[in-house]
Amino acid sequence: MKLSKLLFILVLVLSLTGCKEYGEKRIVKLLTVSDDKISIYYYDYSADKPSYSVAEKENTGIENTLVQLLSDHEYDLKLCRYVVCDSNIIENNIEELFNGLVNSKFSMDTVIIQGDTDAEPEKYTELKKYSYPIYSYYVENGKINGIVENVADNTKNVISDSKLHTILTQQQSFAFDIIKNNIDKGTYVFEHNGVQLSANLENITVFCTVKNDTAQIKVNAMLKNFKGMPSNKTSKQQFMEIAQNSIENNIISLLDDRYMTEKLKLNWFDNLCSCNAVDIEVNLK
């Protein structure tokens, strides 16, 4: 086979598949979720002429369907600002939806919206043109407790950066509540000089503050009902250190590879939101 023919075939293959160096460049702008289907709207830059396209699958479970949908091609999720859901998804499946977004590594800039999933996608591409209600939920004692922000009315809304920032901050608290609710609140047992000691871990609170796109996490925990607590001051201090290390290790184990780059460093959503070190405070009383 002649060299010129080989070069022609190589160029043809690259033009059909997209050069590996640049990737496929499918930029997702919108995700819609209904009972029937999940759709992603994206700009396809892999072709010679960029085009607005849609990919969708039957909704057989939000988390699994999202994984299947996003595995068909290489998508860039950094600019996906909106997730539009039917009202019953918001009411009945909000936690499953949020878990799906976390597992699929959607941007922290993504705002969950109750709206019309059959509306024209152009309605969602520019914030100033958007007129559907935007909801932000907060979690208390492991339960979704209500609507924090509802900017819906019958006119078009221009949402200020500060208001949007408030919504994003409360969306982030969702993720940290997931961490909090998975921390084992059972009895911790320690060995100290051959003596078995124990205490109950209670009153865990996870705080998150966001400033200039940087998140600071603080975890407060409390140990109570000590059994076998040494009376010696030095031994008591050693016990406290052992207890604190045990709690910290328990919390760290929850921050798996999706969130961690190194010990106590978080890497939320591929550096889209840079985070400081986790600040773990343990109150031992």
Task: Name these PLM-found stretches.
Residues K2-F8, L16-K285:
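Membrane-proximal alpha-helical signals and transmembrane carboxylates
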